Regions:
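Predominantly transmembrane beta-strands of Gram-negative outer membrane beta-barrel pores used
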Residues: 170, 198-202, 218-224, 231-240, ...
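Short, acidic Ser/Thr/Gly-rich low-complexity loop/linker segments typical of extracellular
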Residues: 44-54
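N-terminal periplasmic accessory domains that precede
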Residues: 84-90, 135-138, 157-160, 172, ...
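Flexible loop and strand-edge segments within Gram-negative outer membrane beta-barrel domains
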Residues: 269-290, 296-365, 371-389
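Extracytoplasmic beta-strand/coil segments of soluble accessory domains associated
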Residues: 136-177
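Short, acidic, small-residue-rich periplasmic hinge/interaction motif at the N-terminus
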Residues: 26-31, 36-41, 69-73, 83-128, ...
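Structural signature of Gram-negative outer-membrane beta-barrels, strongest in the C-terminal barrel
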Residues: 405-409, 413-419, 427-486
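Short acidic/polar hinge/loop motifs at secondary-structure boundaries
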Residues: 55-58, 158, 176-203, 291
Length: 486
């Protein structure tokens, strides 16, 4: 019996015995490191620190090196001897990299894949890159639209699409026909660049919704909306040619549904420039005041928008001085300088009203009312052209989706123009001529669209308008479009 007890004690003494290792892990600030990894090298034995940064781990026979690691700190390896006490481990912060900034510029020009029209959208990012001062200068970075001077003496510009310019391109603001008739020659300068949120350029055949005037395409300008984020922006501009501009826009949310916005613009480029010394101004002198106030009500079913705008502009050009005067034969002595002066007052207003019957199907009924008063007094030497144009436009539209592929829209419209003109066609002091013109054009349209997953889009529409001057004329649109999107 004694032999058995002695043998058991001897074998127990020969068996490997594992000890417990205790310790605490802190950072270099003296704060405990929670959930740090603690393990022996070349073993599967490990643990983590508790909420106080302490740990307890069994030490296998032969294990000497204890590793402590945690994210954001350098690993620490401790050699543990047999006669160790409780370990106190300090983790040092790992090497920190400098801040990395990833900068991306928003896409400036977007090709609309979901639109049946051949449409490019110029976003606010592209407008900022162009550093434009008005609509006419906003296409400098976009090759899809060609803007040229129709008359260098007055600064009148025109847009060319598909090789044709002038009246073949329809101008829209907020999808409402605008800048027609007397306002067309200088319309590209009436819209300040900082006011614009985006521009949609459609080439070729367009929708029948907006009338019959678009032959080569449409250009629609979207202004900054008051219902977007509240903001205050001030934009100042000055050039070496002594052109100065100041722009201001602000949005205020009166409550969760009602908001208003104010946009203001002042332009002054009244210094005379005759760099080539030919006696004529190289560019017209322009001073413009522009002010717009917008309101928006965004209800669950009823949506309302309204805007009023006023603009005043003085534009002068022509001869700056007489050159090559020959006093022996009279020369130009006693003759007046050839001057061009154009004074414009323009007032606009519109309202948009929409009632949504079914949001899922997009069923809605909308009424648009728009009006403008354009008064222009122009003198070209002795020639005169003074015109007062009044325009009224209204449109009633209904739209609905039968399902996710088929939709239809129908509507009625009325456009009224009145011109009161005073002019002199001869370059002398002959008498004035007078003329009054008016035109009323009611119209109706129906348009059907088939859209298969934005890959195959077919649109067909028919429109009929009746002019009290030119009679009735129908307009048909059939625009197929298909592509494969990967």
């Amino acid at each position: 019996m004694k032999f058995i007890v002695f043998l058991g004690a001897f074998l127990w003494h020969l068996m490997p015995v594992s000890a417990q290792v205790k310790g605490m892990v802190k950072d270099n600030q003296g704060e405990p490191v929670v959930a740090a990894n603690v393990f022996w090298i070349n073993t599967t034995n490990g643990t983590v620190t508790d909420e106080n940064g302490t740990f307890t781990i069994e030490q296998p026979v032969g294990a000497k090196k204890l590793v402590v690691s945690f994210i954001g700190y350098e690993n620490d390896t401790i050699v543990v001897e047999n006669d160790h006490k409780e370990l106190a481990i300090i983790l040092q912060g790992s090497v920190m990299m400098d801040e990395v900034q990833v900068v991306e510029r928003k896409i400036g020009v977007v090709k609309s894949r979901s639109s049946v029209l051949n449409q490019d959208m110029i976003s606010s990012a592209e407008l900022a890159r162009a550093a434009c001062c008005n609509l006419g200068e906003s296409f400098t970075t976009n090759p899809s639209v060609d803007v040229s001077y129709a008359d260098a003496a007055t600064g009148a510009r025109q847009i060319k699409l598909l090789g044709l310019s002038g009246t073949y391109v329809q101008m829209l603001t907020e999808n409402i026909p605008n800048y027609r008739g007397a306002s067309a020659p200088f319309a590209l300068g009436y819209i300040p660049g900082p006011w614009m949120q985006s521009i949609q350029v459609s080439k070729g055949s367009s929708s029948v919704k907006n009338g019959y005037e678009a032959i080569t395409g449409q250009i629609n300008v979207e202004f900054k909306k008051p219902q977007t984020t509240q903001s205050l922006n001030v934009n100042l501009f000055a050039s070496s040619k002594e052109k100065y501009e100041a722009n201001f826009d602000a949005n205020v949310h009166l409550n969760s549904r009602l908001s208003t916005g104010v946009l203001a613009h002042y332009e002054n480029s009244t210094r005379s420039h005759d760099d080539n010394g030919d006696g004529f101004l190289d560019m017209p002198k322009v001073e413009q005041y522009n002010l717009q106030n917008r309101w928006a009500w965004m209800g669950d079913q009823y949506v309302f928008q309204a805007s009023v705008k006023a603009m005043k502009e003085d534009r002068t050009s022509g001869q700056a001085t007489h050159l090559h005067v020959d006093n022996s034969v009279g020369g130009f002595v006693g003759r007046e300088l050839y001057k061009i002066g154009i004074h414009t007052d323009r007032y606009e207003a519109f309202t948009k009203n929409a009632y949504i019957f079914d949001k899922e199907r997009g069923t809605n009924l909308a009424l648009i009312l728009s009006g403008s008063l354009h008064k222009q007094d122009a003198g070209y030497g002795y020639k005169l052209y003074n015109v007062d144009q009044k325009n009224l436009y209204t449109s009633l539209m209904f739209e609905t989706n039968f399902d996710e592929r088929n939709s239809i829209s129908a509507g009625l419209s009325l456009n009224y123009d009145y011109f009161n003109q005073t002019y002199r066609l001869e370059n002398d002091d002959t008498g004035l001529l007078y003329g009054k013109e008016k035109e009323t054009v009611p119209g109706a349209y129906v348009q059907y669209t088939y859209n298969w997953k934005d890959k195959i889009i077919l649109m067909g529409g028919i429109r009929a308008d009746h002019s009290d001057i030119y009679g009735t004329f129908p307009l048909k649109r059939k625009i197929p479009r298909s592509y494969i999107r990967m």
